[in-house]
Structure formats: C-alpha cells, structure tokens
Amino acid sequence: MNLLVNFLAYVVGIPILAGLFCLVIPERLKILTRLLAFIVTLVSLAATVRIFILKPMYWPPVPVPAFIVDNLSALAGLGISFFALVVTVYSFGYIEKNNGKYFGYLLMTLGSALGAVFANNLILLVVFWGILPALLYLLVTLRQTIAASASAKKALIIIGATDALMIFGIGLLWKMTGTFAMDGMHIALDGVLPYAAFLCILIASFAKAGAV
C-alpha cells in the first residue's frame, strides 16, 4: 500500500507513538519533548487539512474500512488537531514539571480522539473512546493535589458509568443490524430498540463532552 492509502493510519498512529516516546524522554531534555509535541501537532493539523480536502477517505480500502472520513468527521478531525496545536503552544508557558508525561498524554489524547472520530467499526470506536477518559484522568492528576485527584476520580466514575451505556447502545445496534461497521448499518425506525440505542449513545456522548 502506498502512502496515501495508509494516510489515515498514520494520522491516528503517529501521535500515539510520539506520545509513548515522550514518556521515556528524561525531564532534563524537556526542550526535545516540547519540540516533538509541537512538530507532531503541527503535522497533524496539516494532515487533517489534507484529509478535509481529499475526503472521502477509507482505510483499509477493502473489504470493510476500519476508518472512514466523511464531511462531519473531516471537520471534527480538523478541529481536534487545531485545538491540540493551540493547547500545546499555550502549555509551553506554564508546564514546568512532568513535561514528558504531560505532552505524552496530550499527544496520545490527540491520536485517540482522531481514532474515535474516524472510526468506522464500533468496536474500534469503543477502544479509542475508552482510552480518552484514562488519559484525561492521568492529565488531571499530574497536578498532584487533593482537589485535582478528587475531580479526576469523579470524572472517571461518571464517564465509566456512561460508557457502559454506550456499549449497551452499540450492542442494540449490532442486534438490529448484525454488523459493527457503521457504513453497513441500515436501521428502520420501528419499535423501541432504535430509540433506546440512540439515547444510550447520546447520553454517553454528552457525559464525555461535559467531562472534557
């Protein structure tokens, strides 16, 4: 497969790998950590601009794409990358300690968020969706204060509970359609199940947005 075919996989995977690398960079080399975070978020923004122009995109192209970019996900991906770059640059002024952990978690959050918005498979969506609250918890607890720890635990409990609703909603979708591929779902709005699935996923989405 050529670069263009694998483009979506790189856009999701590179920030996650770069974030893992930041975790092992010594604190004395915080300039390297910051430079890496800036470069990755800048490249991510450029990549999502390209994705927005080239949409629709699929990866892998056959038989069932794991990632799909349409108009909505392209716009969401562009916004995620833009704000990741803004947060990264803004953080240079106030993050003094734990640079490796902070920017590592931030980059992994970027990759996981892009993975969630581009995911076509609902199982893949749940995986990326579940990683995000864990990273949020780790970012908040970097402040190492009692208040921060308590807030992080409350957010994690709320998100964890509502994520169970999302999984239940996805289970209902699978029961109705027999597939986890979103582009292959054709749902008739008959009976209670479609509306129950919608409400479960909607509540989980609002809970995650509120926590973030």
Where does each model-flagged region fall?
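Helix-loop junctions at the membrane interface of multi-pass solute transporters
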Residues: 20-24, 89-98, 137-147, 202, ...
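Transmembrane alpha-helical segments of multi-pass membrane transport proteins and ion-pumping complexes
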Residues: 19-20, 82-85, 163-168, 205-212
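Membrane-interface helix-loop-helix modules in multi-pass inner-membrane proteins
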Residues: 58-76, 122-133, 137, 205
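Alpha-helical multi-pass transmembrane bundles of energy-transducing inner-membrane proteins
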Residues: 102-108, 112-192, 207-209
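Short helix-boundary/re-entrant hairpin motifs in multi-pass inner-membrane proteins
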Residues: 39, 57, 150-151, 155, ...
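Transmembrane helix-loop-helix hairpins at membrane boundaries of multipass inner-membrane proteins
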Residues: 1-104, 176-188
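Short alpha-helical transmembrane interface motifs in multi-pass membrane proteins
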Residues: 3, 72-74, 121-122, 154, ...
